[in-house]
Amino acid sequence: MGARASVLSGGKLDAWEKIRLRPGGKKKYRLKHLVWASRELERFALNPGLLETSDGCKQIIGQLQPAIRTGSEELRSLFNTVATLYCVHERIEVKDTKEALEKMEEEQNKSKNKKAQQAAADAGNNSQVSQNYPIVQNLQGQMVHQAISPRTLNAWVKVIEEKAFSPEVIPMFSALSEGATPQDLNTMLNTVGGHQAAMQMLKETINEEAAEWDRLHPVHAGPIAPGQMREPRGSDIAGTTSTLQEQIAWMTSNPPIPVGEIYKRWIILGLNKIVRMYSPVSILDIRQGPKEPFRDYVDRFYKTLRAEQASQEVKGWMTETLLVQNANPDCKTILKALGPQATLEEMMTACQGVGGPSHKARVLAEAMSQATNSAAAVMMQRGNFKGPRKTIKCFNCGKEGHIAKNCRAPRRKGCWKCGKEGHQLKDCTERQANFLREDLAFPQGKAGELSSEQTRANSPTSRELRVWGRDNPLSETGAERQGTVSFNCPQITLWQRPLVTIKIGGQLKEALLDTGADDTVLEEMNLPGKWKPKMIGGIGGFIKVRQYDQILIEICGHKAIGTVLVGPTPVNIIGRNLLTQIGCTLNFPISPIETVPVKLKPGMDGPKVKQWPLTEEKIKALTEICTEMEKEGKISRVGPENPYNTPIFAIKKKDSTKWRKLVDFRELNKRTQDFWEVQLGIPHPAGLKKKKSVTVLDVGDAYFSVPLDKDFRKYTAFTIPSINNETPGIRYQYNVLPQGWKGSPAIFQSSMTKILEPFRKQNPEIVIYQYMDDLYVGSDLEIGQHRTKIEELREHLLRWGFTTPDKKHQKEPPFLWMGYELHPDKWTVQSIKLPEKESWTVNDIQKLVGKLNWASQIYPGIKVRQLCKLLRGTKALTEVIPLTEEAELELAENREILKEPVHGVYYDPSKDLIAEIQKQGHGQWTYQIYQEPFKNLKTGKYARMRGAHTNDVKQLAEVVQKISTESIVIWGKTPKFRLPIQKETWETWWVEYWQATWIPEWEFVNTPPLVKLWYQLEKEPIIGAETFYVDGAANRETKLGKAGYVTDRGRQKVVPFTDTTNQKTELQAINLALQDSGLEVNIVTDSQYALGIIQAQPDKSESELVSQIIEQLIKKEKVYLAWVPAHKGIGGNEQVDKLVSQGIRKVLFLDGIDKAQEEHEKYHNNWRAMASDFNLPPVVAKEIVASCDKCQLKGEAMHGQVDCSPGIWQLDCTHLEGKVILVAVHVASGYIEAEVIPAETGQETAYFILKLAGRWPVKIVHTDNGSNFTSAAVKAACWWAGIKQEFGIPYNPQSQGVVESMNKELKKIIGQVRDQAEHLKTAVQMAVFIHNFKRKGGIGGYSAGERIIDIIATDIQTKELQKQITKIQNFRVYYRDSRDPIWKGPAKLLWKGEGAVVIQDNSDIKVVPRRKVKIIRDYGKQMAGDDCVASRQDED
């Protein structure tokens, strides 16, 4: 924090600490606000160093100000802090933040006026648009664009990954895209193109805005004058139909057209929509995490509360109830003890350091030490005393310049108050916070090297001399405390001589701590008391000394009394006689890697899976392996107190007689917390820069070198069984990361990165690529120097317990790394041999496809489409599959390609990347990325069909998208593309179909076959061509259908089909029209499905029928396709509909429409009810609702989405027309009882509850804290009727807001029927009737009335069934899974039906067919092996 704290110094810091956060508030700015601000700036990709000057603050304000309106609270706080800091730098006197903002505004207004005057004078001189993406003037006077940097792109990708479209994304996007061109913005969007749903929303917004732009800026008639630029269209602004040069010209013309800013505004509009969709936060969702500090939780709670749409009273209730209710258990206990009237300040004080990670206690210690400091220090804090400021010193490591909160050193063990182990500060019973900085004895500035068994900040495996401080043995408590070890002690490393300052006889001397010396020997000095002569032997011979007994000596602040020898010694020595008294120990720490804390998923326990029987040879092999592992400390034995178990087994190693131990961690993996993978992919050799010297290392026993969290080890327990259960099994648990456990890769990678970090910093000229246990080390050093560095690296790794075996240490090329073969100036994949086989199984083909995919990185032209087709459907791995002719041909072609070895080259950052794409046919594409022709960096293929129907242009865009993403990952930039498509073809397509996956810079390359559009649909009807009205119909039950057409020239045709659907017949009808028409034709359909397929102009399809239509379309000269709504009485459409419906559609529903409309006018029932009651198609029923003006106020309310216990009702009062309506909702069904009550009193409410209980089974009523619900009358009524009353939040958080939404729904229905009733109470009962019986939807598609009856009846049946289930519990089930032939079990029988049973195996509930289970009675603890009861027992 040293750098961050240096933002202000001296008088400026005093001025800063006088400014109040709010006008009239108590809190003032402190140093911590500067630290926070500098951290926040890093998140916005801004340099924290800018805070040190007023100009820097101005620049920050300029970046943040545009985003303030849409920004989050954090952004606003950051802006306020920087504005206040600016005033301090400029020495503008301000009292609080508000005043600082006003002064800032005044300054900005002044500077705006100055700039306006200067702009006129400087026009033409300054062409720089932005700092971020400058469009600069080169030496020739041309405007040149500097492309967006990979660092900015990386920051943007990280923002999306971390924030996941939370509100902070918008200001961050705004800051990162300052001054960008549309092409830059498209590059940014391309990098996050994988978020398809979000990109789709963004695309729609951009489409709308572009259309609006085109509407407001119509094209001028006539040709453009020479030398004049054309005006940008909407698609030009979005960078789809404009070139980079055009964009630069628009942005730098006079007057400029800021296409970048306009496009950015459109994107921000789209991002706003996305944010609203992705971040719907309700106050009920705000809960304190198990390790979240209370202060952070309160911040989130109030931030959300401010946005909540509720009255002040409701917000008050939320603060009183929800804040405590949703705190974590630790904080909740403390808050409840404080009582109901506690202030927020008291709550935060009480919960400080509780509920957060252990390091939060450091903050509390810091605060306590400051609180106990002298009054002068307090005066200085307040700014009353201008004396010299005391330097900040860390409590954790003792260094100056930062506080414990920001300390990077590992946390010291033990309590921060008394120094003892076994508890933390919050649990300390010591009354005095004896934690003043002077108590820490850190001799000679070595305070940074603190004692900790687990971590070493500076010297991982150094021998260390540690002085364990005991309390003064002369004190009263000395006798009690003998042997108590305190961690408040120095640690002295042995890289240098351990010299310390000692105090003896009132004199200070320097002495050497010598654990090899028996006695303490000091140079000539006078000591009080009697002495005896003595001779002592040393390395230089014997010397005469004086022996003084019972001498008091102070070493590192710790006192000891013992014998001291005085004589002519070359150096003062403190020997073991005194070192043992002060608890000094010599330590040899090993494998000091910091353990990563790991937890199970909330609410889950460890695995308890039984060990299955193993053969004798496997047991012997496992016993040998585990004995060896135990000796090495990788595993340790556990006793019967550990209830957890994971099964193990053994397999033979490949081409060896040795055995390998495998642990089946599937169950533990399900229960372990999720981890963030540190690396998202593997490094690629094409991204390596060419290096003079290269070495490849492999870390031996990688996982077994990293310790596992002590508290988690018990869950990894496993058992080696004995033969024939002769003795109990031997049980072990892992002390290190186990193979096969889900946390091992992430923890190993994280540990390895931390270990390599200091080496990387010391040797920036060396490149280390790290993936799991494979290390690639490259440098431009001479080979001798390079190898010296490699040895340093190996030594560095060895200090941390990582070995790099010589066996896998590759010094000479070719290097085998990550499946690649690396040479000094080229690379390839390790040799690939395709197997020759007579017959191919599914497994063989899967392996073959995997090999070919791997080879396609560098071998251009590899295809696998036909081979993949063979694997379609669910097939057993051993099933033999005959190769089709196409697959055999494809395989033969691939063999030819692989015959000649192909190499790739390394990346040169000074040259441009170029990507060239070729079409291979059958939807397959190949591409090469290179910097020099015929020297490929890498190659690849693409054969994915994103939809059933597509065309080449669409697929080409997908290939480009894939290559762009791949290039950004490997090289941090996108290549220039060379595509086999004419510019005209491209523009024809994208004028209609532009979207959020834009093409970067590209040029046409004439590589056959070229991509083209095979046919085009007309925009307007073709005059003089015959018009075909087409339609199709099918019966769902019989699958019979008809397709046909009627033309405007009197022709008609109907063709019957079998085994068809409505959608197929619609397409068949179009196909018929195309077959029977001339070269020009107009076709009118009422099918949106058919229209959607054909308008996208596909040229290939998986559907045979669509392929036929495509063939017909290619033959035509002109085709116009139009859509009309069905059943609207449109001439030709109505005729053809009747023609194809005869004998197909069961009932002509037209008769029911009038009745349905009539009923809707009365009851305003929803479309589901009408579709069900009058046998109408959903589209017709929806049309009736759509045409009703009273039903268009809002969308329909969702019913029945909450599934709760049958006896829960929620009650609430709502107000309408000055009257009170009491509403009761049955939570599970959405059924309503409501009444207008004379007054909102307890008496009326109690009477209503009794009426409700008389009609329905009511077990629980959930209400708010209104006075009528908390009254004695209601309590008495509930007690009499046996109803439990709940307030606040019900236990099921899903059921929140049920009454609120029903109130709105009821008011909406009342509004629809109000004019039919004179009195409100009549309208209320009409609305209740409509809601309960005339609206269908939700669970089961019932009305609420039907649903409540169904739920109550089901509840009664379930209770009856429950009685029978207790009988079923006495049975055990053995069962087989779909493919696995081994019998599993025993499982618990939950339910037995005719065709299947429901069983519970461990915690999983499964449904298994009857034919795959054996049900037996539970005969106690007898083992059910393959040859005992389970196999022989008849089925029950």
From Swiss-Prot:
Spell out the residue ranges making up region: Interaction with membrane phosphatidylinositol 4,5-bisphosphate: 73-77
Spell out the residues of the site Cleavage.
133-134, 364-365, 378-379, 434-435, 442-443, 489-490, 588-589, 1028-1029, 1148-1149
* Positions of the UniProt region annotated as RT 'primer grip': 815-823
Quote the record's binding site residues for Mg(2+) 2.
1031, 1066, 1086, 1137
Q: Where in the chain is the DNA-binding region found?
A: 1371-1418
Q: Which GO terms describe its molecular function?
A: aspartic-type endopeptidase activity; DNA binding; DNA-directed DNA polymerase activity; exoribonuclease H activity; lipid binding; RNA stem-loop binding; RNA-directed DNA polymerase activity; RNA-DNA hybrid ribonuclease activity
Which portions of the sequence form the region Interaction with host CALM1?
8-43
Activity regulation reads: Protease: The viral protease is inhibited by many synthetic protease inhibitors (PIs), such as amprenavir, atazanavir, indinavir, loprinavir, nelfinavir, ritonavir and saquinavir. Use of protease inhibitors in tritherapy regimens permit more ambitious therapeutic strategies. Reverse transcriptase/ribonuclease H: RT can be inhibited either by nucleoside RT inhibitors (NRTIs) or by non nucleoside RT inhibitors (NNRTIs).
User: Coordinates of motif Nuclear localization signal in the sequence?
Assistant: 26-32
Q: Which residues bind Mg(2+) 3?
A: 1212, 1264, 1300
Q: Which stretches does UniProt call biased (Low complexity)?
A: 116-128
Query: Which part of the chain is the Integrase catalytic domain?
Result: 1202-1352
Region: Interaction with host AP3D1; residue ranges are: 12-19
Cofactor section: Mg(2+)
* Any one GO cellular component localisation term in the record: virion membrane
Q: What is its EC number?
A: 3.4.23.16, 2.7.7.49, 2.7.7.7, 3.1.26.13
Assigned keywords, A-Z: Activation of host caspases by virus, AIDS, Aspartyl protease, Capsid protein, DNA integration, DNA recombination, DNA-binding, DNA-directed DNA polymerase, Endonuclease, Eukaryotic host gene expression shutoff by virus, Eukaryotic host translation shutoff by virus, Host cell membrane, Host cytoplasm, Host endosome, Host gene expression shutoff by virus, Host membrane, Host nucleus, Host-virus interaction, Hydrolase, Lipid-binding, Lipoprotein, Magnesium, Membrane, Metal-binding, Modulation of host cell apoptosis by virus, Multifunctional enzyme, Myristate, Nuclease, Nucleotidyltransferase, Phosphoprotein, Protease, Repeat, RNA-binding, RNA-directed DNA polymerase, Transferase, Viral genome integration, Viral nucleoprotein, Viral penetration into host nucleus, Viral release from host cell, Virion, Virion maturation, Virus entry into host cell, Zinc, Zinc-finger
Residues at the site labelled Cis/trans isomerization of proline peptide bond = 222-223
Q: Where does Zn(2+) bind?
A: 1160, 1164, 1188, 1191
**Catalysed reaction(s)?**
Specific for a P1 residue that is hydrophobic, and P1' variable, but often Pro; Endohydrolysis of RNA in RNA/DNA hybrids. Three different cleavage modes: 1. sequence-specific internal cleavage of RNA. Human immunodeficiency virus type 1 and Moloney murine leukemia virus enzymes prefer to cleave the RNA strand one nucleotide away from the RNA-DNA junction. 2. RNA 5'-end directed cleavage 13-19 nucleotides from the RNA end. 3. DNA 3'-end directed cleavage 15-20 nucleotides away from the primer terminus; 3'-end directed exonucleolytic cleavage of viral RNA-DNA hybrid; DNA(n) + a 2'-deoxyribonucleoside 5'-triphosphate = DNA(n+1) + diphosphate
The record places the motif (Tryptophan repeat motif) at 986-1002
Motif annotated as Nuclear export signal, chain positions = 16-22
Zinc fingers (Integrase-type): give the ranges. Answer: 1151-1192
More details: HIV-1 lineages are divided in three main groups, M (for Major), O (for Outlier), and N (for New, or Non-M, Non-O). The vast majority of strains found worldwide belong to the group M. Group O seems to be endemic to and largely confined to Cameroon and neighboring countries in West Central Africa, where these viruses represent a small minority of HIV-1 strains. The group N is represented by a limited number of isolates from Cameroonian persons. The group M is further subdivided in 9 clades or subtypes (A to D, F to H, J and K).
Name of the protein? Gag-Pol polyprotein
Please report the organism this UniProt entry assigns to the protein.
Human immunodeficiency virus type 1 group M subtype D (isolate Z2/CDC-Z34)
